[in-house]
């Protein structure tokens, strides 16, 4: 039995979906433990593309059990739409292969409205750059103990009471502070009770279910969303998401004890990208950045927004390794850098004339850091589909070796293309 956690080490979009899909071959179960439908995982299997937002990537493989943990915030309408889309392409979903934690907090229509109204009021200069899908306001309600959970839909009187109390506050804010329309209780109540009936067969007390699976010796893969620099505590606050994106979130977001985790794999893009607002020390606003964006198809799977691109930042990935306790890293999208005459990696920062190897908590400081770069020769040869280390161009090998040196965590997996077959496995996390 092994419990493996997969986390992003940058600002999300590192390519976690493909690696989860790859490792699901050895897993019996895949558990999504945080985030919502603001995150998107893109998989390419046998030339067919799948984009998932809530359902764990393991759902594509027959015979695997998947679960949405209590750390996720769930929009029932978005989940049902995703299930329907998967059914259209032949992926059958049933209570046999998908469970949803009964403690999962629900995103309601007013969460979306609050999210969008807040961004609008902040304006272009100060907005966070959220997806506007209600993630932050839902987590806010959860922390304030006014959240509505999946289990509440099966007690209609309690659900209506909670909804009424919340709407008293929400409608006051929307109408009087944001000058937006409010909501009618009956409309939300009826829609959510109907969707609750549809999801009832999937509802599960997840912690005992996972405990039983561990007792039976099953391999469990825990799938994170976003990345460590979007973590609500250790990210570039306030330009972050509202959940725990590091490895500790796998425990609080599923009910599995910390001592049960065996291996933490960090997914690392060979360069760096970010969607939305916030500091980005190695951002490239030049031809190299445009090259990476175009060749890497750097557009968000959820929003379609173009991603900001930059050189690899070892300070950021070391920070991620520290807070998640990484055992190994998986490098993705190395092939995107094929054809560049030279490549650079950031090994440290200079702030107000002083060098540091750490990500400062002060966002204003991070905004003005000067990256300390090492420049290395690029490679003209293609790395696409390389499955042996010796097949990689010498310059690509040198780049990866230096990357490992400055990060301090060994490479477990190297991805050289979008398909699951385009992968070089150095150490399988389930066999570590």
Curated annotation (Swiss-Prot):
It catalyses: IMP + L-aspartate + GTP = N(6)-(1,2-dicarboxyethyl)-AMP + GDP + phosphate + 2 H(+). Belongs to the adenylosuccinate synthetase family. Its EC number is 6.3.4.4. NCBIfam families: PRK01117.1 (NF002223), purA (TIGR00184). The gene is purA. This is Adenylosuccinate synthetase. Plays an important role in the de novo pathway of purine nucleotide biosynthesis. Catalyzes the first committed step in the biosynthesis of AMP from IMP. Mg(2+) binds at residues 13, 40. One of its GO terms (cellular component) is cytoplasm. GO terms for biological process: 'de novo' AMP biosynthetic process; IMP metabolic process. The keyword Ligase applies. Binds 1 Mg(2+) ion per subunit. GTP binds at residues 12-18, 40-42, 307, 333-335, 415-417. Its cofactor is Mg(2+). The active site is at 13 (proton acceptor), 41 (proton donor). It comes from Magnetococcus marinus (strain ATCC BAA-1437 / JCM 17883 / MC-1).
């Amino acid at each position: 039995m092994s419990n493996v956690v997969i986390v992003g080490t940058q600002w999300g979009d590192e390519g976690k979906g493909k690696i989860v899909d790859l490792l699901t071959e050895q897993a019996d179960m895949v558990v999504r433990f945080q985030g919502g439908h603001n995150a998107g995982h893109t998989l390419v299997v046998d030339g067919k593309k799948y984009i998932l937002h809530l359902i764990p990537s393991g759902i594509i493989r027959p015979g695997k059990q998947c679960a949405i943990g209590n750390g996720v915030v769930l929009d029932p309408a978005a989940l049902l739409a995703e299930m329907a889309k998967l059914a259209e392409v032949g992926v059958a979903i049933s209570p046999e292969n998908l469970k949803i934690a009964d403690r999962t907090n629900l995103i309601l229509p007013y969460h979306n409205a609050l999210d969008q109204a807040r961004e609008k009021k902040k304006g272009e200069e100060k907005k966070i750059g959220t997806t506007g899908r209600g993630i932050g306001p839902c987590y806010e309600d959860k922390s304030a103990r006014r959240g509505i959970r999946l289990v509440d839909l099966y007690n209609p009187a309690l659900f209506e009471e909670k909804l009424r109390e919340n709407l008293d506050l929400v409608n006051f804010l929307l109408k009087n502070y944001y000058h937006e329309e409010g909501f009618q209780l009956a409309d939300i109540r009826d829609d959510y009770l109907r969707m609750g009936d549809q999801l009832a067969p999937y509802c599960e007390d997840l912690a005992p279910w996972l405990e039983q699976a561990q007792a039976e010796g099953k391999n469990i893969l825990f799938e994170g969303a976003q990345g460590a620099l979007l973590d609500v505590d250790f990210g570039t606050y306030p330009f972050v998401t509202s959940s725990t994106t590091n490895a500790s979130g796998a425990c609080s977001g599923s009910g599995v004890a910390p001592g049960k985790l065996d291996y933490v794999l960090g997914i690392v893009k060979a360069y760096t990208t970010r969607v939305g607002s916030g500091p980005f020390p190695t951002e490239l606003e030049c031809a190299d950045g445009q090259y990476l964006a175009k060749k890497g198809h750097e557009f968000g799977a959820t929003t379609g927004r173009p991603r900001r691109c930059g050189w690899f930042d070892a300070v950021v990935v070391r920070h991620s390794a520290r807070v998640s306790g990484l055992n190994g890293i998986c490098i993705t999208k190395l092939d995107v850098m094929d054809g560049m005459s030279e490549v650079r990696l950031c090994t440290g920062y200079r702030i107000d004339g002083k060098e540091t190897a750490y990500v400062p908590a002060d966002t204003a400081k991070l905004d003005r850091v000067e990256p300390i770069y090492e420049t290395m020769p690029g490679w003209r040869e293609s790395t696409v589909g390389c499955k042996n280390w010796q097949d990689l161009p010498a310059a690509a090998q040198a780049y990866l070796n230096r990357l490992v040196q400055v990060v301090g965590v060994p490479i477990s997996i190297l991805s050289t293309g979008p398909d699951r077959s385009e992968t070089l496995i150095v150490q399988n996390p389930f066999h570590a």
